[in-house]
A protein has these predicted regions:
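Conserved HGGG/HGGXW glycine-rich cap/lid loop of the alpha/beta-hydrolase fold
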Residues: 50-98
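A short, glycine- and basic residue-enriched loop/turn
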Residues: 68-69, 137, 297
Length: 322
């Protein structure tokens, strides 16, 4: 009789496990599909990726150099189940229009202007803003114009303090603006080539033991849009304009101090270009910001996608942005 009872219990347990397995098979995670879109603004096409329900709170992902919205291809599906996610390509980057730099002067004011117009075209008023690298000068210009539209900030290796730049790095940006010689131009132009993009950007913060965490898809995609002299000159002009951001840091810092936006800082602490002091400096003006120094480099969203997604979801849930 005891054996029958034991067999019966084991049978129920086995059946229960099989049922759970079957349920899991039928309930695996399916994120909303990402769509690939163009909006025409002032006769210019801006490309953007979108995913999620438009009724949900909006997250806008602003990319850096030398990339595009492609840098968020893995992050988007991790956020879009709960949020409506928009990731535009800057004017002159990725699939957006590449206007001739001989007739269009590329500045961060220009990029911010077009990105703001894109959000207006999409009827997006309030949003969480995620910024990385070049995304910071674009995003902070937008925030200066309309600080009340920002529900929260997510800062990922996005500098707004001189603390995050070595003196050598500061001098690089200053001379990029002031030195108009051909020698300087040739140097800046060389930074947009294949070797610099791969080895001085994506692999710069890595070592031989962890090279395999960085997908070659990233730089392969970027280099397609840095294939011509025109494309590379666009980025040279942005290098030449970058010092305007350093000069704007005090204004941005005052804005942050006055508005106290809910802020999550997820910073790759191995970043040699925008070092971790730049992350810590935010706490001077935003003492309530949440700071996480990640075991990653400048492209932390490529290296630590899942960890960043988890931090974002927990942070937004904690602040009732859902």
């Amino acid at each position: 009789m005891k054996h029958l009872i034991i067999i019966a219990i084991l049978s129920l347990a086995l059946f229960g496990c099989n049922s759970i397995k079957e349920d899991n098979k039928n309930n695996f995670f399916l994120p909303p599909a990402t769509t690939y879109n163009y909006a025409e603004i002032d006769s210019v096409k801006l490309f953007y990726r979108a995913a999620g329900d438009k009724k949900n709170p909006v997250i806008v992902l602003l990319h850096g150099y030398p990339s595009s919205s492609h840098s968020y291809r893995n992050l988007i599906p991790m956020l879009s189940t709960h949020y409506y996610v928009i990731a535009p390509d800057n004017l002159g980057s990725g699939y957006s229009s590449h206007l001739d730099p001989k007739t269009t002067k590329y500045t961060f004011d220009l990029l911010a202007n077009y990105t703001q117009k894109l959000l207006e075209t999409l009827h997006i008023e309030n949003y969480v803003m995620y910024m990385q690298d070049f995304g910071a000068p674009v995003g902070y210009r937008m925030m200066m114009e309309n600080p009340n539209r920002i529900d929260a900030l997510i800062v990922q290796n996005a500098n707004a303090y001189l603390d995050g730049l070595t003196e050598k790095r500061q001098n690089f940006f200053r001379t990029a603006q002031t030195d108009t010689s051909k020698t300087k131009y040739d140097f800046l132009y060389s930074l947009t080539g294949k070797d610099a993009v791969v080895n001085k950007q994506y692999l710069f913060d890595l070592n031989e033991t962890n090279m395999n965490i960085q997908s070659p898809d990233a730089w392969t995609h970027d280099l397609v849009f840095l294939n011509s002299k025109k494309d590379r000159d666009i980025q040279v002009q942005l290098f030449q304009d970058y010092n305007t951001n350093l000069l704007s840091y005090p204004k941005w810092q005052n804005m942050l101090k006055e508005n106290q936006p809910k802020t999550l800082i997820t910073w790759g602490k191995k970043d040699l270009k925008f070092n971790a002091n730049g992350a810590k400096a935010y706490l001077k003006d935003l003492p309530n910001a949440e700071l996480h120094l990640l075991d990653a480099g400048h492209f932390a969203a490529e290296e630590k996608t899942r960890e960043i997604a988890e931090l974002i979801l927990k942070f937004l849930d904690k602040h009732d942005i859902k």
